[in-house]
């Protein structure tokens, strides 16, 4: 799980905006959550990227720009359904990304293996992806 969630944060940092210390929140033991999906932080299966910029319940259209949403859609498409995004939840929380499959799901293990392989190959993986290529845009369209 850590490999996949770190990949999401790295893609955000490389393709949307640089992240600073404190911009990513992951596992917590604080049981106070604003909505059900935030409880995924308790199990370490979710991260929030810049939660103060993109808070729970923010009005749609006030968070990420349309171009940034294209990047998020590409990240989701690249993760093949393993990652869920808070921009698709009610209430909205565009900073929220979570593992969207059950423990032991083979898709999670397959994705983590692929990411680890890309991390070892220069010129591939996070930091080398152009989410605006036509083929990638077509695949990501289902996640907008």
Locate the predicted segments by residue.
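A generic short-segment signal for beta-strand/edge and adjacent turn/coil regions
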Residues: 12-20, 65-68
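Catalytic cores and adjacent binding grooves of peptidoglycan-active enzymes
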Residues: 38-44, 55-144
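Active-site acidic/histidine clusters and adjacent loop/turn architecture
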Residues: 1-16
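Mid-length scaffold segments of soluble, non-membrane domains
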Residues: 15-60
């Amino acid at each position: 799980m850590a490999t996949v969630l770190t990949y999401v944060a790295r893609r955000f940092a490389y393709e949307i905006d640089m992240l600073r210390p404190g911009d990513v929140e992951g596992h917590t033991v604080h049981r106070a959550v604003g909505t059900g999906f935030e409880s995924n932080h308790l199990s370490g299966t979710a991260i929030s990227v810049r939660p103060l910029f993109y808070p729970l319940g923010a009005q749609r259209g006030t968070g990420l720009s349309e171009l940034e949403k294209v990047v998020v859609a590409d990240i989701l498409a690249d993760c093949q359904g393993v990652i869920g995004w808070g921009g698709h939840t009610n209430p909205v929380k565009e900073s929220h990304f979570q593992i969207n499959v059950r423990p032991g799901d083979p898709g999670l293990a397959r994705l983590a293996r692929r990411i680890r392989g890309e991390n070892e190959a220069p010129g591939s993986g996070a930091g080398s992806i152009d989410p605006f290529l036509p083929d990638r845009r077509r695949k990501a369209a289902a996640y907008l």
